[in-house]
């Protein structure tokens, strides 16, 4: 068992004491008392301006932009937003494109002038894109070629919508201005001076919608910045506890951007976390394992935070790769439970490589709990310890707080929570129990404070009167050496109410009989799946990189020839 020099509580007392860089104080935020960082930048614009340098920031194919370059381009675009497009404080500016450098420049520009940056899912079809535009009512949308073509197919768009295109040709069906032309017209401009407050709204990111259209999550500058500093603090606490030793490198650290920027982990955990650390960000046109390995070697990237399917690809392919991956120091990420065998494989890949994971939501700006290094290797099923600026609890159906080891709904409160669902006041009210946000996640907290996420409350299969958690089935299946990802779900059954189905992303096809025999040593008889679907590609994920269980289930019903079954 790992020996620690200090407990986490003792480390927080030391590192967050008055006069320290990560000093914490209680402050009234929206009528509630929350812990905030005293020395935090007040706004996102302050964050950008305070971290200018000639070091590389964005690496995309042959393009390299320094921190100064990005801010300079953002100043030009911000000036255009104010003078050419009439963007005022509180107006929405939408971004919909691949992970191009322009995505980040546009985000810088919008959030520096008090606009609300709206991140649309680049995978949306034209109907979804139209819904997103009608929902957020942006004054301006910035798109690439694919999104411009989809925009041209949208029906019912407001005539007032202004469009800027990048890396795109003109479309005969929709008027747009060219990104480069807009910048050139303002090449001598400086960043407009707009007064911003920490509690001003900064972003709308869309949550995964399992039943209807995703909800827009509205967040403030303060919430986002305190999330960023809390992740920084976590590393300092590990050092203070004596469970992590910082490594001095003679080259610039870098992050592999393996997640879309419209996702909270891509935008905040990967991108904005680079600023204060002065890390470079390696971007890809799309996910490709070989391209990722080559980029890691070329740029000597040190961190990759991504879903388990991607980190699994890196570790699996990296063992036999011709590429030098010795620069990597941290691999992991949240979004979905990582198989214990993958956690172990990260630890075994290199003595210098540390695994990590965490749990957060779009509504918490990605912050929640986290776990790193030996703590994670010892508890591969845990999502970690609570952030220092948040409080968590587990409650039963009646709202009574449960003790360690008891399973219930995880609730959370603190500085980084969102301001509400855009245009959905009723949904916002329903999401809270007083000042506590109802996550909808089933969890337990052990006696040491480590949180274990056991699935969503709606992810229960009721088979013959037995309540069966999807997480337990998935954990057992993930122990099989050929399974990369697993999703369990209930399939309607006339006799039992529901039968158990699973969809697996596998290295190679597994004999179903052998798999059931394997599971018989780990699960009760009534927990062994009746229906098994195998595929050689990752499972479908939503905006928050969580597996879309309902969509996986519907596709399984179709592939199994059970389409006559009616599912609620």
Language model segments and positions:
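Conserved AMP-binding/adenylate-forming core of the ANL superfamily
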Residues: 36, 40, 54-88, 92-100, ...
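ANL superfamily adenylate-forming
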Residues: 22-25, 62, 149-198, 225, ...
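Conserved AMP-binding/adenylation subdomain of ANL enzymes
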Residues: 225-254, 258, 262-302, 317
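AMP-binding/adenylate-forming catalytic domain of the ANL superfamily
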Residues: 524-546, 563-568
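Conserved pre-ATP/AMP-binding loop-to-beta segment of ANL
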Residues: 187-206, 213, 247-254
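AMP-binding/adenylate-forming catalytic core of the ANL superfamily
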Residues: 124, 131, 141-143, 304, ...
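Gly/Ser/Thr-rich phosphate-binding loop
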Residues: 276-277, 301-305, 315-378, 391
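Conserved AMP-binding A3 loop
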Residues: 66-68, 202-230
């Amino acid at each position: 068992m790992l020996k620690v020099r200090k407990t986490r509580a003792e480390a927080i007392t030391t590192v967050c004491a008055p006069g320290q860089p990560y000093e914490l104080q209680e402050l009234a935020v929206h009528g509630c008392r929350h812990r905030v960082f005293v020395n935090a930048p007040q706004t996102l614009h302050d964050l950008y301006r305070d971290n200018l340098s000639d070091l590389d920031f964005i690496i995309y194919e042959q393009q390299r932009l320094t921190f100064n370059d990005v801010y300079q381009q953002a100043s030009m675009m911000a000036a255009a937003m104010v003078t050419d497009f009439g963007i005022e404080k509180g107006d929405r500016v939408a971004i919909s494109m691949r992970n191009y450098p322009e995505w980040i420049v546009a985000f810088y520009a919008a959030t520096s002038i008090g606009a609300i940056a709206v991140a649309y899912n680049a995978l949306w079809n034209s109907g979804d894109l139209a819904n997103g535009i009608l929902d957020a009512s942006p004054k301006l949308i910035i798109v690439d070629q694919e999104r411009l073509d989809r925009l041209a197919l949208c029906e019912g768009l407001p005539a007032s919508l202004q469009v800027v295109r990048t890396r795109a040709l003109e479309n005969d069906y929709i008027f747009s201005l060219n990104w480069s032309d807009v910048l050139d017209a303002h090449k001598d401009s400086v960043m407009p001076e707009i007064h911003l407050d920490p509690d001003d709204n900064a972003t709308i990111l869309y949550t995964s919608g399992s039943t209807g259209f995703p909800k827009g999550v509205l967040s403030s500058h303060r919430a986002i910045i305190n999330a960023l500093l809390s992740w920084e603090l976590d590393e300092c606490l590990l050092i203070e506890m004596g469970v992590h030793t910082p490594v001095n490198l003679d080259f610039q650290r870098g992050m592999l951007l393996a997640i879309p920027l419209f996702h909270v982990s891509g935008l905040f955990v990967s991108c904005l976390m680079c600023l204060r650390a002065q890390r470079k960000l390696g971007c890809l046109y799309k996910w490709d394992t070989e391209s990722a390995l080559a980029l890691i070697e070329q740029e000597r990237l040190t961190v990759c935070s991504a879903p388990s399917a991607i980190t699994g690809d890196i570790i699996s392919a990296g063992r036999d790769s011709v590429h030098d991956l010795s620069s990597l120091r941290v691999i992991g990420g949240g979004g979905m439970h990582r198989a214990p065998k993958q956690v172990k494989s990260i630890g075994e890949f290199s003595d210098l490589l540390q695994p990590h994971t965490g749990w957060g939501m779009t509504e918490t700006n990605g912050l929640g709990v986290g776990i790193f290094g030996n703590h994670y290797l010892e508890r591969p099923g845990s999502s970690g310890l609570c952030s220092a600026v948040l409080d968590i609890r587990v409650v039963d159906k009646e709202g009574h707080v449960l003790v360690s080891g008891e399973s219930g709904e995880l609730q959370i409160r603190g500085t980084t929570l969102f301001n509400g669902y855009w245009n959905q006041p009723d949904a916002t009210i329903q999401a809270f129990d007083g000042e506590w946000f109802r996550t909808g996640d089933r969890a337990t907290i052990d006696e040491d404070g480590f949180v274990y996420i056991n699935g969503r409350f709606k992810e229960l299969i009721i088979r013959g009167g037995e309540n069966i958690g999807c997480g337990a089935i998935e954990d057992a299946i993930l122990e099989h050496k050929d399974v990369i990802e697993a999703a369990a779900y209930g399939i309607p059954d006339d006799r039992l109410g529901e039968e158990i189905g699973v969809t697996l992303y596998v290295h190679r096809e597994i004999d179903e009989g052998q798999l059931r025999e394997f599971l018989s040593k780990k699960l009760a008889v009534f927990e062994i799946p009746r229906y098994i679907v195998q595929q050689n590609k990752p499972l479908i994920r939503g905006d928050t990189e969580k597996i879309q269980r309902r969509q996986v289930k519907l596709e399984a019903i179709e592939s199994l020839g059970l389409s006559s079954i009616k599912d609620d």
